Amino acid sequence: MFTLKKSLLLLFFLGTINLSLCEQERDADEEERRDDSEERDIEVEKRFLPLIASVAANLVPKIFCKITKKC
Protein backbone atom coordinates (compact mmCIF):
# COMPACT_ATOMS: atom_id res chain seq x y z
CA MET A 1 0.00 0.00 0.00
CA PHE A 2 2.86 2.35 0.84
CA THR A 3 4.51 1.83 -2.57
CA LEU A 4 1.18 2.53 -4.27
CA LYS A 5 0.87 5.84 -2.41
CA LYS A 6 4.45 6.67 -3.29
CA SER A 7 3.93 6.02 -6.99
CA LEU A 8 0.65 7.97 -7.03
CA LEU A 9 2.35 10.88 -5.30
CA LEU A 10 5.16 10.74 -7.86
CA LEU A 11 2.67 10.70 -10.74
CA PHE A 12 0.78 13.64 -9.23
CA PHE A 13 4.02 15.58 -8.79
CA LEU A 14 5.17 14.90 -12.35
CA GLY A 15 1.74 15.77 -13.72
CA THR A 16 1.77 19.07 -11.84
CA ILE A 17 5.18 19.94 -13.26
CA ASN A 18 4.04 18.98 -16.75
CA LEU A 19 0.92 21.13 -16.43
CA SER A 20 3.01 24.06 -15.21
CA LEU A 21 5.37 23.76 -18.18
CA CYS A 22 2.43 23.59 -20.58
CA GLU A 23 0.96 26.78 -19.11
CA GLN A 24 4.28 28.58 -19.48
CA GLU A 25 4.58 27.44 -23.08
CA ARG A 26 1.02 28.50 -23.82
CA ASP A 27 1.67 31.94 -22.31
CA ALA A 28 4.79 32.29 -24.44
CA ASP A 29 2.81 31.31 -27.55
CA GLU A 30 0.14 33.90 -26.75
CA GLU A 31 2.77 36.62 -26.37
CA GLU A 32 4.31 35.56 -29.67
CA ARG A 33 0.92 35.72 -31.36
CA ARG A 34 0.40 39.24 -30.07
CA ASP A 35 3.75 40.21 -31.60
CA ASP A 36 2.83 38.49 -34.88
CA SER A 37 0.03 40.96 -35.62
CA GLU A 38 2.61 43.56 -36.65
CA GLU A 39 4.33 41.03 -38.89
CA ARG A 40 0.99 40.09 -40.43
CA ASP A 41 0.30 43.74 -41.24
CA ILE A 42 3.64 43.95 -43.02
CA GLU A 43 2.87 40.76 -44.95
CA VAL A 44 -0.52 42.13 -45.99
CA GLU A 45 1.12 45.33 -47.20
CA LYS A 46 3.64 43.29 -49.19
CA ARG A 47 0.84 41.34 -50.83
CA PHE A 48 -1.24 44.37 -51.77
CA LEU A 49 1.49 46.71 -52.99
CA PRO A 50 2.32 44.63 -56.11
CA LEU A 51 -1.38 44.29 -56.84
CA ILE A 52 -1.92 48.04 -56.61
CA ALA A 53 1.18 48.68 -58.71
CA SER A 54 0.01 46.34 -61.47
CA VAL A 55 -3.47 47.90 -61.54
CA ALA A 56 -1.92 51.37 -61.71
CA ALA A 57 0.42 50.25 -64.49
CA ASN A 58 -2.59 49.12 -66.53
CA LEU A 59 -4.77 52.17 -65.85
CA VAL A 60 -2.25 55.00 -66.23
CA PRO A 61 -1.59 54.43 -69.97
CA LYS A 62 -5.33 54.18 -70.67
CA ILE A 63 -6.06 57.40 -68.79
CA PHE A 64 -3.13 59.16 -70.48
CA CYS A 65 -4.39 57.95 -73.86
CA LYS A 66 -7.89 59.31 -73.22
CA ILE A 67 -6.63 62.65 -71.95
CA THR A 68 -4.17 63.33 -74.76
CA LYS A 69 -6.17 61.46 -77.42
CA LYS A 70 -2.92 60.02 -78.78
CA CYS A 71 -3.57 56.31 -78.83
Curated annotation (Swiss-Prot):
Key words, A-Z: Amphibian defense peptide, Antibiotic, Antimicrobial, Cleavage on pair of basic residues, Cytolysis, Disulfide bond, Fungicide, Hemolysis, Secreted, Signal
Residue numbers covered by the propeptide annotation in the UniProt entry: 23-45
Disulfide bonds listed in the record: 65-71
Record field: transmembrane: none
Cellular component, GO, one term: extracellular region
Tissue: Expressed by the skin glands.
A GO biological-process term: defense response to fungus
Compartment(s) where it occurs, according to its Swiss-Prot or TrEMBL record: Secreted
Signal peptide, first to last residue: 1-22
Family to which this protein belongs: Belongs to the frog skin active peptide (FSAP) family. Brevinin subfamily.
Function: Has antimicrobial activity against Gram-positive bacteria and fungi but has weak or no activity against a range of Gram-negative bacteria except P.faecalis. Active against the Gram-positive bacteria E.faecium 091299 (MIC=37.5 uM), S.aureus ATCC 25923 (MIC=2.4 uM), S.carnosus KHS (MIC=19 uM), B.licheniformis X39 (MIC=2.4 uM) and R.rhodochrous X15 (MIC=1.2 uM) and a lower activity against E.faecalis 981 (MIC=75 uM). Active against the Gram-negative bacterium P.faecalis X29 (MIC=9.5 uM) is virtually inactive against E.coli ATCC 25922 (MIC=150 uM), and inactive against P.aeruginosa and S.typhi.
The protein's name: Brevinin-1V
